[in-house]
Amino acid sequence: MAYPFQLGLQDATSPIMEELLHFHDHTLMIVFLISSLVLYIISLMLTTKLTHTSTMDAQEVETVWTILPAIILILIALPSLRILYMMDEINNPSLTVKTMGHQWYWSYEYTDYEDLNFDSYMIPTQELKPGELRLLEVDNRVVLPMEMTVRMLISSEDVLHSWAVPSLGLKTDAIPGRLNQTTLMAMRPGLYYGQCSEICGSNHSFMPIVLEMVPLSYFETWSAVMV
Protein backbone atom coordinates (compact mmCIF):
# COMPACT_ATOMS: atom_id res chain seq x y z
CA MET A 1 0.00 0.00 0.00
CA ALA A 2 1.00 3.65 -0.17
CA TYR A 3 2.22 5.66 2.80
CA PRO A 4 2.23 9.43 3.51
CA PHE A 5 5.30 11.19 2.08
CA GLN A 6 6.34 7.98 0.32
CA LEU A 7 9.20 8.44 -2.17
CA GLY A 8 9.50 4.93 -3.63
CA LEU A 9 7.07 2.66 -5.42
CA GLN A 10 4.23 0.88 -3.63
CA ASP A 11 4.75 -2.65 -2.35
CA ALA A 12 4.28 -5.27 -5.05
CA THR A 13 1.17 -7.41 -4.66
CA SER A 14 1.26 -9.29 -7.97
CA PRO A 15 3.97 -11.20 -9.87
CA ILE A 16 3.86 -8.58 -12.64
CA MET A 17 4.53 -5.73 -10.21
CA GLU A 18 7.45 -7.65 -8.71
CA GLU A 19 8.95 -8.00 -12.17
CA LEU A 20 8.41 -4.28 -12.79
CA LEU A 21 10.19 -3.41 -9.54
CA HIS A 22 13.16 -5.60 -10.47
CA PHE A 23 13.30 -4.01 -13.92
CA HIS A 24 13.14 -0.55 -12.34
CA ASP A 25 16.12 -1.37 -10.09
CA HIS A 26 18.02 -2.92 -13.02
CA THR A 27 17.51 0.14 -15.23
CA LEU A 28 18.24 2.57 -12.41
CA MET A 29 21.58 0.89 -11.74
CA ILE A 30 22.57 1.25 -15.40
CA VAL A 31 21.58 4.93 -15.35
CA PHE A 32 23.56 5.44 -12.14
CA LEU A 33 26.72 3.87 -13.61
CA ILE A 34 26.46 5.93 -16.81
CA SER A 35 25.87 9.14 -14.86
CA SER A 36 28.84 8.41 -12.59
CA LEU A 37 31.10 7.81 -15.60
CA VAL A 38 30.00 11.05 -17.27
CA LEU A 39 30.54 13.06 -14.07
CA TYR A 40 33.97 11.49 -13.64
CA ILE A 41 34.99 12.44 -17.17
CA ILE A 42 33.69 15.99 -16.72
CA SER A 43 35.61 16.35 -13.46
CA LEU A 44 38.80 15.16 -15.18
CA MET A 45 38.31 17.68 -17.98
CA LEU A 46 37.88 20.49 -15.47
CA THR A 47 40.80 19.55 -13.21
CA THR A 48 43.54 18.48 -15.64
CA LYS A 49 45.35 20.13 -18.53
CA LEU A 50 46.11 16.84 -20.28
CA THR A 51 43.83 17.31 -23.28
CA HIS A 52 44.35 15.82 -26.72
CA THR A 53 43.65 18.85 -28.86
CA SER A 54 45.66 17.52 -31.79
CA THR A 55 43.93 14.14 -32.07
CA MET A 56 42.42 13.74 -35.54
CA ASP A 57 41.49 10.04 -35.56
CA ALA A 58 40.78 7.49 -32.83
CA GLN A 59 39.07 4.44 -34.30
CA GLU A 60 39.41 2.41 -31.10
CA VAL A 61 37.53 5.04 -29.10
CA GLU A 62 34.86 5.35 -31.78
CA THR A 63 34.42 1.59 -31.80
CA VAL A 64 34.02 1.48 -28.02
CA TRP A 65 31.48 4.30 -27.84
CA THR A 66 29.45 2.65 -30.60
CA ILE A 67 29.44 -0.92 -29.32
CA LEU A 68 29.09 -0.15 -25.61
CA PRO A 69 25.80 1.84 -25.92
CA ALA A 70 24.41 -0.92 -28.15
CA ILE A 71 25.17 -3.51 -25.46
CA ILE A 72 23.59 -1.32 -22.77
CA LEU A 73 20.42 -0.87 -24.85
CA ILE A 74 20.18 -4.64 -25.34
CA LEU A 75 20.54 -5.17 -21.57
CA ILE A 76 17.60 -2.81 -21.07
CA ALA A 77 15.44 -4.04 -23.98
CA LEU A 78 15.51 -7.79 -23.30
CA PRO A 79 13.99 -7.74 -19.77
CA SER A 80 11.58 -5.01 -20.88
CA LEU A 81 10.25 -7.14 -23.75
CA ARG A 82 9.94 -10.13 -21.43
CA ILE A 83 7.72 -8.17 -19.04
CA LEU A 84 5.63 -6.77 -21.91
CA TYR A 85 4.85 -10.29 -23.12
CA MET A 86 4.05 -11.39 -19.57
CA MET A 87 1.56 -8.52 -19.20
CA ASP A 88 -0.22 -9.47 -22.44
CA GLU A 89 -0.40 -13.18 -21.62
CA ILE A 90 -3.72 -14.56 -20.39
CA ASN A 91 -3.75 -18.13 -19.08
CA ASN A 92 -7.18 -19.62 -18.37
CA PRO A 93 -8.68 -16.88 -16.18
CA SER A 94 -10.82 -18.11 -13.30
CA LEU A 95 -13.05 -15.03 -13.35
CA THR A 96 -13.91 -12.23 -15.78
CA VAL A 97 -14.97 -8.75 -14.71
CA LYS A 98 -16.12 -6.09 -17.18
CA THR A 99 -15.23 -2.52 -16.22
CA MET A 100 -16.85 0.53 -17.81
CA GLY A 101 -15.64 4.07 -17.27
CA HIS A 102 -18.12 6.94 -16.97
CA GLN A 103 -17.92 10.62 -16.13
CA TRP A 104 -17.10 10.24 -13.25
CA TYR A 105 -17.48 6.77 -11.78
CA TRP A 106 -16.81 3.13 -12.64
CA SER A 107 -19.30 0.34 -13.23
CA TYR A 108 -18.47 -3.35 -12.85
CA GLU A 109 -20.10 -6.52 -14.14
CA TYR A 110 -19.10 -10.04 -13.13
CA THR A 111 -19.76 -11.84 -16.41
CA ASP A 112 -19.60 -15.32 -14.86
CA TYR A 113 -22.67 -14.50 -12.75
CA GLU A 114 -26.14 -13.85 -14.09
CA ASP A 115 -26.94 -10.62 -12.28
CA LEU A 116 -23.91 -9.32 -10.42
CA ASN A 117 -23.12 -5.73 -11.36
CA PHE A 118 -22.91 -2.36 -9.63
CA ASP A 119 -21.65 1.19 -9.92
CA SER A 120 -18.76 2.46 -7.84
CA TYR A 121 -18.77 6.13 -6.76
CA MET A 122 -16.28 8.01 -4.60
CA ILE A 123 -17.43 8.65 -1.03
CA PRO A 124 -17.52 12.42 -0.36
CA THR A 125 -15.12 13.73 2.29
CA GLN A 126 -17.91 14.69 4.71
CA GLU A 127 -19.25 11.11 4.69
CA LEU A 128 -15.96 9.34 5.43
CA LYS A 129 -15.66 7.14 8.51
CA PRO A 130 -12.60 7.18 10.81
CA GLY A 131 -9.66 5.48 9.12
CA GLU A 132 -10.96 5.83 5.58
CA LEU A 133 -8.85 7.57 2.96
CA ARG A 134 -9.91 10.89 1.44
CA LEU A 135 -10.58 10.81 -2.33
CA LEU A 136 -9.86 7.05 -2.44
CA GLU A 137 -12.83 5.35 -0.78
CA VAL A 138 -15.82 4.12 -2.80
CA ASP A 139 -19.32 3.01 -1.90
CA ASN A 140 -18.95 -0.36 -3.68
CA ARG A 141 -15.59 -2.11 -3.68
CA VAL A 142 -14.54 -4.63 -6.31
CA VAL A 143 -14.27 -7.90 -4.38
CA LEU A 144 -12.03 -10.49 -6.05
CA PRO A 145 -10.48 -13.81 -5.00
CA MET A 146 -6.77 -13.76 -4.22
CA GLU A 147 -4.23 -16.16 -5.77
CA MET A 148 -6.47 -16.62 -8.82
CA THR A 149 -6.14 -15.21 -12.32
CA VAL A 150 -8.79 -12.57 -12.99
CA ARG A 151 -9.39 -11.09 -16.43
CA MET A 152 -10.50 -7.47 -16.58
CA LEU A 153 -12.33 -6.26 -19.69
CA ILE A 154 -12.11 -2.47 -19.79
CA SER A 155 -13.97 0.07 -21.91
CA SER A 156 -15.70 3.45 -21.62
CA GLU A 157 -19.19 4.82 -22.14
CA ASP A 158 -18.18 8.40 -22.94
CA VAL A 159 -14.58 9.72 -22.99
CA LEU A 160 -11.10 8.30 -22.49
CA HIS A 161 -10.41 6.91 -19.02
CA SER A 162 -7.63 4.72 -17.64
CA TRP A 163 -8.08 1.98 -15.05
CA ALA A 164 -4.96 1.85 -12.87
CA VAL A 165 -3.97 0.08 -9.64
CA PRO A 166 -0.26 0.71 -8.87
CA SER A 167 0.23 -2.09 -6.31
CA LEU A 168 -0.78 -4.64 -8.94
CA GLY A 169 1.19 -3.03 -11.75
CA LEU A 170 -1.98 -2.32 -13.73
CA LYS A 171 -2.82 0.55 -16.05
CA THR A 172 -5.18 -0.07 -18.96
CA ASP A 173 -6.87 2.58 -21.09
CA ALA A 174 -10.67 2.65 -21.24
CA ILE A 175 -11.51 3.72 -24.79
CA PRO A 176 -15.08 4.24 -26.10
CA GLY A 177 -15.99 1.58 -28.66
CA ARG A 178 -12.96 -0.57 -27.86
CA LEU A 179 -12.60 -3.43 -25.37
CA ASN A 180 -9.15 -3.74 -23.77
CA GLN A 181 -8.20 -6.55 -21.44
CA THR A 182 -5.66 -7.20 -18.74
CA THR A 183 -5.12 -9.81 -16.05
CA LEU A 184 -4.42 -9.52 -12.37
CA MET A 185 -3.53 -11.88 -9.56
CA ALA A 186 -2.98 -10.73 -5.99
CA MET A 187 -0.69 -12.84 -3.83
CA ARG A 188 -2.15 -11.67 -0.51
CA PRO A 189 -5.44 -10.26 0.80
CA GLY A 190 -6.01 -6.58 1.37
CA LEU A 191 -7.37 -3.32 0.00
CA TYR A 192 -5.65 -1.92 -3.07
CA TYR A 193 -6.37 1.59 -4.27
CA GLY A 194 -6.12 3.17 -7.69
CA GLN A 195 -7.50 6.08 -9.65
CA CYS A 196 -8.46 7.06 -13.16
CA SER A 197 -5.13 7.88 -14.82
CA GLU A 198 -6.36 9.71 -17.91
CA ILE A 199 -7.62 13.28 -17.69
CA CYS A 200 -11.34 12.89 -18.43
CA GLY A 201 -12.99 16.12 -17.37
CA SER A 202 -13.61 18.37 -14.39
CA ASN A 203 -14.10 15.52 -11.88
CA HIS A 204 -11.25 13.36 -13.16
CA SER A 205 -9.66 13.34 -9.69
CA PHE A 206 -12.81 11.96 -8.09
CA MET A 207 -13.22 8.48 -9.60
CA PRO A 208 -11.08 6.15 -7.46
CA ILE A 209 -10.74 2.38 -7.71
CA VAL A 210 -10.75 0.03 -4.72
CA LEU A 211 -10.01 -3.69 -5.03
CA GLU A 212 -10.71 -5.92 -2.06
CA MET A 213 -8.75 -9.15 -2.47
CA VAL A 214 -10.12 -11.93 -0.27
CA PRO A 215 -9.83 -15.74 0.07
CA LEU A 216 -11.96 -17.76 -2.33
CA SER A 217 -14.37 -18.94 0.39
CA TYR A 218 -15.13 -15.34 1.40
CA PHE A 219 -15.60 -14.34 -2.24
CA GLU A 220 -18.09 -17.16 -2.79
CA THR A 221 -20.08 -16.05 0.25
CA TRP A 222 -20.03 -12.41 -0.91
CA SER A 223 -21.11 -13.28 -4.46
CA ALA A 224 -23.98 -15.43 -3.16
CA VAL A 225 -25.24 -12.51 -1.06
CA MET A 226 -24.87 -10.02 -3.93
CA VAL A 227 -26.71 -12.19 -6.44
Curated annotation (Swiss-Prot):
Transmembrane feature ranges: 15-45, 60-87
Keyword Metal-binding set for record: yes
GO biological process, one term: ATP synthesis coupled electron transport
Swiss-Prot/TrEMBL catalytic activity: 4 Fe(II)-[cytochrome c] + O2 + 8 H(+)(in) = 4 Fe(III)-[cytochrome c] + 2 H2O + 4 H(+)(out)
Binding sites annotated in the UniProt record for Cu cation A2: 196, 198, 200, 204
Gene Ontology MF annotations: copper ion binding; cytochrome-c oxidase activity
Keywords from the named record: Copper, Electron transport, Magnesium, Membrane, Metal-binding, Mitochondrion, Mitochondrion inner membrane, Phosphoprotein, Respiratory chain, Translocase, Transmembrane, Transmembrane helix, Transport
Chain residues that bind Cu cation A1: 161, 196, 200, 207
Cofactor(s) needed by this chain: Cu cation
Residue ranges annotated as Mitochondrial matrix topological domain: 46-59
Cofactor details (free text): Binds a dinuclear copper A center per subunit.
EC number in record: 7.1.1.9
Chain positions found as Phosphotyrosine: 218
Residues that bind Mg(2+): 198
Residues on Mitochondrial intermembrane side: 1-14, 88-227
Main location: mitochondrion
Top EC group: translocase
Xref: InterPro entries: CcO_II, CcO_II-like_C, CcO_II_C, Copper_CuA, Cupredoxin, Cyt_c_oxidase_su2, Cyt_c_oxidase_su2_TM_dom, Cyt_c_oxidase_su2_TM_sf
Annotated GO CC locations: mitochondrial inner membrane; respiratory chain complex IV
Entry keyword annotation includes Signal: no
PANTHER family named in the record: CYTOCHROME C OXIDASE SUBUNIT 2, CYTOCHROME C OXIDASE, SUBUNIT II
Binding partners and assembly: Component of the cytochrome c oxidase (complex IV, CIV), a multisubunit enzyme composed of 14 subunits. The complex is composed of a catalytic core of 3 subunits MT-CO1, MT-CO2 and MT-CO3, encoded in the mitochondrial DNA, and 11 supernumerary subunits COX4I, COX5A, COX5B, COX6A, COX6B, COX6C, COX7A, COX7B, COX7C, COX8 and NDUFA4, which are encoded in the nuclear genome.
Role according to the record: Component of the cytochrome c oxidase, the last enzyme in the mitochondrial electron transport chain which drives oxidative phosphorylation. The respiratory chain contains 3 multisubunit complexes succinate dehydrogenase (complex II, CII), ubiquinol-cytochrome c oxidoreductase (cytochrome b-c1 complex, complex III, CIII) and cytochrome c oxidase (complex IV, CIV), that cooperate to transfer electrons derived from NADH and succinate to molecular oxygen, creating an electrochemical gradient over the inner membrane that drives transmembrane transport and the ATP synthase.
Family designation: Belongs to the cytochrome c oxidase subunit 2 family.
The protein's name: Cytochrome c oxidase subunit 2
The organism's taxonomic lineage, starting at the top: Eukaryota, Metazoa, Chordata, Craniata, Vertebrata
